[in-house]
Each structure stands twice: as structure tokens, then as C-alpha cells.
Amino acid sequence: MQKIKTNRSAAKRFKRTKSGKFVYSKSHGSHILTKKNRKRKRSLRKSHILDSSNNKELKRLLPGM
């Protein structure tokens, strides 16, 4: 039987917390920042918790986490 592979694109985008929730960072926060206002850039800095409806699919993509 083969080993279950981790989906590398998902592994780079999500981290798992101790409680089992998944944390990710929002996109559009790395460049072309001059036209984005201060409030938007500040909110892009924070990490966000993934909605629980997507947890089952992400657990399938990340079996080792």
C-alpha cells in the first residue's frame, strides 16, 4: 500500500493549531501596496481562522498534520 501524500500547495498555505483549527494568511498583502489604504493593509497582516465547513477537505489534503 502506498503512503498518503501531503498536498504541498495546501501545506504552504495553512498551519494547524493545537485545537485542530486551520490558520491562513490573506492574499494581496505583499506588493503593490501604495494604492491600498492603511486599514486594508493592517487587516491583511493578521492571520485568519479557516471556516469549519472546510476542515474535512483540508484534513484530507494534509494527512500528516
UniProtKB/Swiss-Prot annotation:
Protein name: Large ribosomal subunit protein bL35
Family label: Belongs to the bacterial ribosomal protein bL35 family.
Example GO biological process: translation
Region (Disordered): 1-65
Comp. bias intervals (Basic residues): 10-19, 33-47
Pfam families in alphabetical order: Ribosomal_L35p
Organism lineage: Bacteria, Pseudomonadati, Thermodesulfobacteriota, Desulfobacteria, Desulfobacterales
Keyword Ribosomal protein among UniProt keywords: yes
Alphabetized NCBIfam families for the sequence: rpmI_bact
HAMAP family given in the database record: Ribosomal_bL35 (MF_00514)
Entries under PANTHER family matching the protein: 54S RIBOSOMAL PROTEIN BL35M, LARGE RIBOSOMAL SUBUNIT PROTEIN BL35M
Keyword terms: Ribonucleoprotein, Ribosomal protein
Residue stretches of biased makeup (Basic and acidic residues): 54-65
Keyword Ribosomal protein: yes
